Amino acid sequence: MPRLSAAVIYLLVILGVSALVALAWQAYPVSGSQRLRCQPACAQADLRSRNLAAADLSYTDLSWATLESANLRGATFLLSVLSGANLRESNLQSADFSNARLDRVDMRRAILVDANLRATDLRSADLREADLRSADLRGAQMSDVRLERANMQGVLLIDAQLERADLYRADLRNADLRQANLREANLRMANLDGADLTGADLAGALLPHGYTEPLLQSDEEP
């Protein structure tokens, strides 16, 4: 096999480095605006720890992207695809995910206070220990979602599909779960004080100790 000359090797190294720089650069926000150079095709982009507050990421493919610990407060993800994305410990307060695809997303310990997740696809998402206080999840598809120990005080889950969802030790105080589908959901040790489950489907669900269907009133002495 012929040996490569030093000049050829040097050229290959330069080309390789240039390609890596180009890939890294496209993930940064464009100067003076909160959009990404890679938009609308940002699949698998590495955006960890980036400051993207109030960014407009609508209609963007961010599937399998890494957004861990990113500041996305007030960002917009209208109709975006984030399937399998890593949003662990990211700040998503007041973010708008209207009609976005978030299936299999990793949002463990993410901040989603006041976030708009209405009609989103969150099937098989991991939201363990996430802060979802006052988030809007009306009509969301959440079958097989993991919400263990999540803070869901005051969350709106009207008409949400939560079949087989794991809500072990979730804080659901004052949550609105009217007409929600909770078939075979795990609600053991969940705090349901003040929650509204009018019309909710609890068939096969594991309920907190001391609670029974259909009105989910506590059987324990006050």
Regions found by a protein language model. Name each.
Residues 1-5:
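N-terminal Lys/Arg-rich, disordered targeting/topogenic segments
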Residues 8-26:
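Hydrophobic membrane-insertion alpha-helices, especially the h-region
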Residues 28-222:
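Tandem repeat scaffolds
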